[in-house]
Amino acid sequence: MVAENQYYGTGRRKSSSARVFMSKNGSGNIIINKRNIDQYFGRETARMVVLQPLELFDMVSKVDVYVTVKGGGISGQAGAIRHGLTCALMKYNELLRVDLRKAGFVTRDARKVERKKVGLHKARRRPQFSKR
């Protein structure tokens, strides 16, 4: 399924999961769910998060990236794509792992939404205490 010059990585963040395919001989095209990165992410911060691993090694214009992402919101999807792209970069060249680890991209952010508990308004918000 994955071609010789393609590298695959799976990324997850919150409730989002991304499948990232990276082609090493590219021109800098980043396609997310069949749309350009500028069309898919309206927020500049989300675009910056996605491009962080590539900018670390000045590879933004050297590779093509094709992504399918589902679940969650804008921030979670951007984080999932970054994690998947990091995994794909490590398959491309294992020597990049040290710098990616130092930048904090390798570790999966395990924080998820805490569940609502019975008797509370939200996950931790208690009902107002009344002395009398």
UniProtKB/Swiss-Prot annotation:
A molecular-function term among this protein's GO annotations: RNA binding
Keyword Ribosomal protein listed: yes
Keyword Ribosomal protein (UniProt): yes
Gene Ontology biological process terms from the UniProt entry: translation
Q: What is this protein called?
A: Small ribosomal subunit protein uS9
The record's InterPro entries line, in alphabetical order, gives: Ribosomal_Su5_D2-typ_SF (IPR020568), Ribosomal_uS9 (IPR000754), Ribosomal_uS9_bac/plastid (IPR023035), Ribsml_uS5_D2-typ_fold_subgr (IPR014721)
Write the record's keywords in alphabetical order, separated by commas: Ribonucleoprotein, Ribosomal protein
Which Pfam families does the entry link to? Ribosomal_S9
Query: Where do the coiled-coil regions begin and end?
Result: none
Gene3D superfamilies in the record: 3.30.230.10
Q: What's any one GO cellular component for it?
A: cytosolic small ribosomal subunit
What protein family is recorded? Belongs to the universal ribosomal protein uS9 family.
